[in-house]
Swiss-Prot record:
The complex is composed of two ATP-binding proteins (ZnuC), two transmembrane proteins (ZnuB) and a solute-binding protein (ZnuA). Keywords: ATP-binding, Cell inner membrane, Cell membrane, Ion transport, Membrane, Nucleotide-binding, Translocase, Transport, Zinc, Zinc transport. This is Zinc import ATP-binding protein ZnuC. It comes from Alcanivorax borkumensis (strain ATCC 700651 / DSM 11573 / NCIMB 13689 / SK2). Its EC number is 7.2.2.20. The gene is znuC.
Amino acid sequence: MPEPLVTVQSVSVTLGGNAVLSDVSLSLAPGRITTLIGPNGAGKSTLARLVLGLVQPDSNHGTVIRRKGLRVGYMPQHIKIDDSLPLTVDRFLWLAAPGPTASRRAALERAGVAHLRRRGVQQLSGGEMQRVLLARALLRKPDLLVLDEPAQGVDVAGQNALYGLLKTVRDELGCAILLISHDLHLVMAATDEVICLQRHVCCSGSPESVSRDPAYHELFGPGAGTPNLALYTHDHDHDHDLHGNATHSHDHNGPCNHD
């Protein structure tokens, strides 16, 4: 396995007198998608901020090791933009990373929304804004991409399309991806490793092994591991656009299996 980009070793974090994380460890390696799952208040966002260097561990309670020169892209759960600002998508990206137009166009193309470059950000749908935020995170060609609830507000087909796109980004850039989610419907089938968090690591491993772990069922309920919930898969011979609609990029000489 490649050398980790970030290693968190036995870290505890206390914020405002409250223990938010306790003895947590994880390793993020290039080319792998890791997903943090857990209920609200489990410490998922705090752990992500720890990885990003925005939160420090408690004194004498673990270490965080980051590879020197690590480039990080971050996609927040929410972003507030003043409705009165006449802000185009291109300008929005420029404010995050000033540079040549070609780099912004390339990031939007990789996120599947190059056609939105001159659109006003206030005119974007929820799914379109998620793709633009992803393009923003990709501008620096990151070694590590951190996404906080990237599919929130997107329907199931759109989520599947987004996770498929993230796999493509991972393959093209060779980056590590850290996903944060509380939605079990699709995310576990779109990841290499799952870490189940409830202020500490309850269980971790492949999606299949975690879905069978008693600690996982204790946290999410006895039905959480059923195929139509945690281990949803979508085998098809078509692609999806950012709204989740099927697009036919394959050869129609044979039968189609559109769902």
